[in-house]
UniProtKB/Swiss-Prot annotation:
One of its GO terms (cellular component) is endoplasmic reticulum membrane. GO terms for molecular function: zinc ion transmembrane transporter activity. Methylation at some His residue by METTL9 leads to reduced zinc-binding. Residues 431-442, 463-473 have a biased composition (Polar residues). This is Zinc transporter SLC39A7. The keyword Mitochondrion does not apply. It is a multi-pass membrane protein. The gene is SLC39A7. The modification Pros-methylhistidine is found at residue 66. Residues 44-56, 66-114, 298-316, 452-462 have a biased composition (Basic and acidic residues). The chain crosses the membrane at residues 11-31, 138-158, 169-189, 214-234, 388-408. Belongs to the ZIP transporter (TC 2.A.5) family. KE4/Catsup subfamily. Keywords: Endoplasmic reticulum, Golgi apparatus, Ion transport, Membrane, Methylation, Phosphoprotein, Transmembrane, Transmembrane helix, Transport, Zinc, Zinc transport. It comes from Sus scrofa (Pig).
């Protein structure tokens, strides 16, 4: 083939060959000697070289330091490279720290600092507020989330636990049960488990320890402790007040079906005894005689009213769950205060965002707690005052987060969980409160609905409907 080429062709081939060799030499001079790098990695040599690269118009200074064992034994080694570029077009500094590329699975850390755009330092929380402004914002936001639900309670048309408000109160109790159970299992417990979750960027194939199961187990134990604490306190208070299990006495309806005899039902209700009827008749006759004489119709000893001791004991029992729920609400507000205080340490915008988030979930939470207090025997004003007292817990949590500078209380911005036991213990207390049948059910209808003896007209209607009402003394 060489014979077929003319002189011009041979000259062109020669020029191309020299050009290729020149490119190889330039590449060797501009990017380092690959052979020397390999020898350095294999044998642990260290060297320094400095050169000028006229193709790019900037200088490079490379420093390599290696201390490692032979790669054939699987030992790890590290490389530190420092590069200083003076370039007309770039003008920035790069600092690279990485492990050897010859061992797969090793991590790489790169830090780039561009002049004028920031400073490298330890990661922390940026504070854009001075101390006085920080406290003013944090405490003001805490007062807002505590006062807003208080004013919402004025719009609820429930004055007390009376038959007139029974239907609406039952709806509010159902709302409270769903809200508190959802808050316990979907907010408090997952938030307590979040710091112990695995990092999402963990590489598969690397060994990992199960030491993280200890904190997760402690969260479960604190939830169980909250449930047990509620049950123990509830039983203790009932025992002290003498509220043992008892029948609520007079006026409960009992339905009996007599299979085979009659398809109708017999309802046994308590009616006034003969002695009571005779005493009432005597009182009426004495009153009539006094009226004829122009005297007072009021009996000497005053009207005799039956004492419903069963209902009073029932009311005492119902208040236990209400006050225990109030204690759980106090602890819950403490964690809300921790979150607000820690978030404002991270900046004004983050604090405002966290305040709005807490406010949106706090309003329905407080409405549910209000319904439980009313159901437990409190009037509307008493329930509102007790709800307002729980704001002390939120203020205390905010102050704790600010005084500890985030610390353990608010190390996670917008989610400061405080001491590790607060969230799971509160969640267990709330779950136990709603699991108690006395917290989600209204007291039985008063006995006055069953005491009156049906008249002749009502008896006729009852006979037509097949229901027999029998009076028992």
């Amino acid at each position: 083939m060489a014979r077929g080429l003319g002189a011009p062709h041979r000259v062109a081939v020669g020029l191309l060959t020299w050009a290729a060799l020149g490119l190889l030499v330039a590449g060797h001079g501009g990017h380092g000697d690959l052979y020397e790098d390999l020898q350095e990695d294999l044998h642990g040599h260290s060297h320094r070289h400095s050169h000028e690269d006229f193709h790019h118009g900037h200088s490079h200074a490379h420093g390599h330091g290696h201390t490692h064992e032979s790669i054939w034994h699987g030992h790890t080694h590290g490389h530190d490279h420092g590069h200083s570029h003076e370039d007309l077009h770039h003008g920035h500094i790069h600092g690279d720290s990485h492990e050897s590329l010859y061992h797969p699975g090793h991590g790489h850390d790169h830090e780039h600092s561009h002049g004028g755009y920031g400073e490298s330092g330890a990661p922390g929380i940026k504070q854009d507020l001075d101390t006085v402004t920080l406290w003013a914002y944090a405490l003001g936001a805490t007062v807002l989330i505590s006062a807003a639900p208080f004013f919402v309670l004025f719009l609820i048309p429930v004055e007390s636990n009376s038959p007139r408000h029974r239907s609406l109160l039952q709806i509010l109790l159902s709302f409270a049960s769903g809200g508190l159970l959802g808050d316990a299992f979907l907010h408090l417990i997952p938030h307590a488990l979040e710091p112990h979750s695995h990092h999402p960027l963990e590489q598969p194939g690397h060994g990992h320890s199960h030491s993280g199961q200890g904190p997760i187990l402690s969260v479960g134990l604190w939830v169980l402790s909250g449930i047990v604490a509620f049950l123990v306190v509830e039983k203790f208070v009932r025992h002290v007040k003498g509220g043992h299990e008892h029948s609520h006495g007079h006026g409960h309806a009992h339905g009996h079906t007599h299979g085979g005899d009659s398809p109708f039902e017999d309802i046994l209700v308590e009616c006034p005894s003969k002695e009571k009827q005779s005493s009432e008749e005597e009182e009426k006759e004495a009153g009539a005689s006094r009226k004829r004489r122009g005297g007072s119709t009021r009996p000497k000893d005053g009207p005799v009213r039956p004492q419903h001791s069963g209902e009073e004991k029932a009311g005492s029992d119902l208040r236990v769950s209400g006050y225990l729920n109030l204690a759980a609400d106090l602890a819950h507000n403490f964690t809300d205060g921790l979150a607000i205080g820690a978030s404002f340490r991270g900046g004004r915008g983050l604090g405002i965002l966290t305040t709005m988030t807490v406010l949106l979930h706090e309003v329905p939470h407080e409405v549910g707690d209000f319904a439980i207090l009313v159901q437990s025997g409190c009037s509307k004003k008493q329930a509102m005052r007790l709800q307002l007292l729980t704001a002390v817990g939120a203020l205390a949590g905010t102050a704790f987060a600010l005084l500890t500078e985030g610390g353990a209380a608010g190390s996670e911005v917008a989610g400061g969980t405080g001491p590790g036991w607060v969230l799971p213990f509160t969640a267990g207390d709330q779950a136990a409160t709603q699991a108690s049948p006395r917290s989600t059910s209204l007291p039985p209808v008063g006995e006055e609905d069953f005491r009156e003896d049906p008249g002749p007209r009502q008896k006729g209607q009852q006979e037509k409907s097949g229901i027999n009402v029998n009076c028992v003394s």
